[in-house]
């Protein structure tokens, strides 16, 4: 049985490649740095949990022993808290190439349509640099460059596409000049298998894409109709400065661990157009990739598809709401602690308890409000908010039960916030 390893095996393309290779009879091992993401992607697969850019040449030589095919589906969109483009796209591939020298294996590189040393984004430039290192080697290699990959799994840009298409009543209109082509995930996975089985010639570089391109707003409309939503009442043109500001804000959040598809790299890539030419693929004997209409016909818009699309923006909205509430409630208390202390002092609570409750609570509010914005601590912060809210409810029953009968309902209003925190805790997961 031939052996294959897939780098980035729990990503959108990596996971599909692993499944397709197994069906084709390969013994497949996936490599990635997150054990939880690997198990969520495929709990029955063989996994090697490693940070790919940290693997040395000597370690690669050990890992490549007996391997027939390496599929490199690892990558990152933009530098951030967890990602380094040069490390993952250039350094890792350079080490892999050095280690594979002289070995009887094939490397299948998953790149991207449009990569170029002169591209407008670091993503495409670093991808091109990695491709060049592989192509300059004497190894047996194939480079596949897909356009926008559509899949049953909502992931990154295609998740945003689903969410934006499902907005109630309105349809955002952005970048009307941007042209987009798509490729079905199964077409890409079949190409990986064909390359792994030696059905494609060595040193082939080809785009994987449908032939037809369309403006991005038209793609949004097509996805909306596919999801089964009524036509929008309003087409809202988003000005370029607003889109730029959203990209900059998403870049900042990227340093807090959020891999938003709204980051400036994705927006610039969309503005440049996501297009390719399938001629090299078809000339090499590849089956023409499915059109967008054929792809969507194979992806029925189920109830869970529509539910995901409608709730896509709910999670970031909930996190932002909780962050603002907890941060500002902490600041307000610190700016006017006397009013907060009066609530306890009039009920004969000892001064030391009052001071600790007011100032300690304010600091806790600030800490939780900022922590929920840091992706690594979001779930823990949501649990902290639930715990502190529960402590407030319990304390009020002991110290100030009259607040429960207050016409403004200060204690009853705690429950919606707790529900929002619980929702964030439940919905958060790794990519």
PLM features: what roles do these ranges have?
Residues 195-262, 273-315:
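Mid/C-terminal beta-alpha module of Rossmann-like enzyme folds, strongest
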Residues 163-183, 187, 191-195, 199-202, ...:
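A conserved pocket-lining segment of Rossmann-fold NAD(P)-dependent short-chain dehydrogenase/reductase
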Residues 45-95, 99-101, 113-117:
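NAD(P)H-binding glycine-rich loop region in Rossmannoid oxidoreductase-like domains
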Residues 4-24:
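N-terminal Rossmann NAD(P)H-binding glycine-rich loop of SDR-like oxidoreductase domains
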Residues 260-338, 352-431:
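Extended, low-polarity transmembrane helix blocks
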């Amino acid at each position: 049985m031939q052996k294959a390893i897939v780098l980035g095996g729990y990503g959108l393309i990596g996971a599909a490649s692993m499944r397709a290779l197994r069906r084709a009879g390969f013994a497949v091992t996936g490599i990635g740095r997150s054990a939880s993401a690997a198990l969520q992607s495929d709990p029955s697969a063989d996994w090697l949990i490693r940070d790919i850019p940290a693997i040395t040449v000597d370690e690669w030589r050990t890992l490549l022993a007996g391997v027939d095919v390496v599929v490199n589906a690892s990558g990152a969109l933009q530098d951030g808290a967890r990602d380094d483009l040069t490390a993952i796209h250039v350094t890792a591939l350079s080490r892999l190439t050095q280690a594979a020298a002289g070995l009887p294996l094939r490397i299948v590189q998953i790149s991207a349509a449009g990569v170029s040393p002169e591209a407008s984004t670091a993503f495409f430039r670093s991808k091109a640099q990695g491709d060049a290192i592989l192509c300059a080697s004497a190894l047996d290699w194939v480079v596949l460059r897909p356009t926008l990959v559509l899949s049953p799994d909502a992931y990154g840009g295609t998740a945003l596409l689903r969410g934006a298409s499902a907005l109630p009543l309105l349809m955002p209109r952005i970048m009307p000049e941007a042209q987009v082509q798509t490729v079905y995930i199964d077409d890409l996975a079949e190409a990986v298998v064909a390359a792994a089985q030696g059905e494609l010639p060595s040193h082939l570089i080809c785009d994987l894409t449908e032939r037809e391109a369309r403006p991005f707003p038209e793609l949004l409309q097509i996805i909306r109709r596919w999801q089964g939503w009524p036509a929008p009442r309003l087409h809202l043109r988003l000005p370029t400065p607003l889109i730029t500001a959203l990209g900059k804000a998403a870049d900042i959040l990227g340093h807090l661990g959020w891999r938003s598809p709204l980051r400036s790299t994705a927006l610039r890539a969309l503005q440049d157009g996501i297009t390719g030419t399938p001629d090299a693929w078809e000339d090499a004997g590849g089956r023409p990739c499915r059109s967008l209409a054929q792809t969507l016909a194979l992806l029925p818009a189920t109830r869970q598809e529509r539910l995901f699309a409608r709730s896509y923006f709910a999670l970031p909205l909930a996190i932002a709401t909780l962050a603002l509430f907890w941060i500002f409630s902490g600041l307000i208390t610190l700016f006017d602690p006397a009013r907060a202390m009066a609530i306890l002092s009039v009920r004969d609570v000892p001064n030391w308890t009052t001071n600790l409750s007011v100032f300690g609570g304010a600091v806790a509010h600030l800490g939780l409000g900022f922590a929920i914005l840091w992706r690594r601590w979001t779930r823990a912060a949501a649990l902290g908010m639930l715990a502190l809210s529960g402590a407030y409810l319990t304390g009020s029953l002991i110290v100030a039960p009259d607040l429960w009968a207050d016409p403004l309902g200060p204690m009853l209003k705690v429950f919606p916030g707790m529900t929002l925190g619980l929702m964030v805790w439940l919905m958060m997961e790794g990519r």
